[in-house]
């Protein structure tokens, strides 16, 4: 039964053998008690409604997925033991119970005002994705390293001053968000995440990246903007699959020569740093290079065939000869 975004204000009647109910993005404020008796129900989608409470759903033994993002729930729902997907992003639950469905594979608890989570959460060994973003967490315990099947982890927008070395024990392949925290450093063990594709460390207090970052061979996109980096490790040039590197808003004065080895790099954002010079060679495949608001007085004699080069607010001595061809193609922004 599907009726998303239909302007419903009340839960409609459904067949007793219904397997899917999708009532997302309506104006429903209450779920009737009889829903707890829908023995065949496998998936219930109630995202974006006005729910403040739910009946006890623990008896729905067929239920595998429960979507409740964007409601007003003040307490954690009572769920069946075989539940695999639970999305509660953007509610007001405040606390997580000690007992959770042990078979959970996807769990979203972001934006709920959580200050801590129970130890039982870190024992959900079937988890593949975990979203704890936009809470008020101050620590992540070492036992997180036991979530061996985890592919996606979002800890962004919390109050973490550190993360445990055991993060490197995870099997993350898709993404790791640690943005908008209070991190002054990340552990060297992070380099063991050699299959991770996307790493976001933006808006922290990082003064350095670990040398081990060069071992993260699977990285396709790395975002470290809004930190306090003064230099980059030479090992960064070993990231053979990297396509986007976002370093804006740091304190970089120079780049390592090894950056030329990033053969797959297409986007390099270096605006709002303190660069005085660039390496003699830049990645040959680079297409977008943003150098706004640095302290450059000159450019290397050869540049890659860029589609866009932004050089505004630098201190260039005249217009370097190397820009002529790019200017003719309309690829350069100087002022």
What are these regions (language model features)?
Residues 1-30, 34-38, 42:
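LRR N-terminal entry segment and analogous cap-like coil->beta motifs
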Residues 6, 26, 49, 68-71, ...:
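Consensus "Asn ladder" position of solenoid repeat domains
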Residues 8-13, 31-34, 51-57, 73-78, ...:
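The feature encodes a structural signal of leucine-rich repeats
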Residues 14-18, 36-41, 59-63, 79-83, ...:
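Leucine-rich repeat
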Residues 87-95, 105-116, 120-139, 151-162, ...:
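Solenoidal tandem-repeat scaffolds enriched in leucines and small polar residues
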Residues 171-282, 288:
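Eukaryotic tandem repeat interaction scaffolds
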Residues 287-335:
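Leucine-rich solenoid repeat scaffolds
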């Amino acid at each position: 039964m599907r009726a998303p975004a239909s302007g419903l204000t009340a839960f409609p009647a459904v067949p007793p053998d219904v397997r899917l109910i999708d009532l997302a993005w309506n104006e429903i404020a209450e779920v009737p008690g009889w829903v707890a008796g829908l023995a065949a129900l496998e998936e219930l989608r109630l995202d974006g409604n006005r729910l403040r409470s739910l009946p006890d759903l623990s008896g729905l033994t067929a239920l595998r997925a429960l979507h409740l993002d964007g409601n007003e729930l003040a307490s954690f729902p009572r769920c069946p033991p075989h539940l695999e997907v639970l999305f509660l992003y953007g509610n007001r639950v405040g606390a997580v119970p000690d007992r959770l469905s042990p078979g959970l594979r996807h769990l979203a608890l972001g934006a709920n005002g959580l200050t801590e989570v129970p130890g039982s959460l870190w024992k959900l060994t079937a988890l593949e994705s975990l979203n704890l973003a936009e809470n008020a967490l101050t620590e992540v315990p070492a036992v997180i390293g036991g979530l061996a099947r985890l592919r996606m982890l979002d800890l962004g927008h919390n109050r973490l001053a550190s993360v445990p070395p055991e993060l490197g024990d995870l099997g993350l392949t898709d993404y790791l968000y640690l943005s908008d925290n209070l991190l002054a450093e990340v552990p060297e063990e992070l380099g063991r995440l050699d299959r991770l594709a996307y790493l976001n460390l933006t808006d922290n207090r990082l003064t350095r990246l670990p040398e081990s970052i060069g071992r993260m061979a699977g990285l396709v996109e790395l975002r470290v903007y809004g930190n306090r980096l003064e230099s980059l490790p030479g090992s960064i040039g070993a990231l053979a699959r990297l396509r986007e590197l976002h370093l804006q808003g740091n304190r970089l004065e120079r780049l390592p020569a090894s950056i030329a080895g990033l053969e797959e790099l297409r986007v390099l954002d270096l605006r709002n740093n303190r660069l005085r010079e660039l390496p003699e060679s830049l990645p040959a495949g680079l297409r977008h290079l943003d150098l706004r608001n640095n302290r450059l007085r000159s450019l290397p004699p050869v540049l890659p065939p860029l589609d866009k080069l932004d050089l505004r607010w630098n201190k260039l001595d005249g217009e370097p000869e190397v820009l002529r061809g790019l200017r003719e193609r309309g690829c350069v922004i100087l002022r």
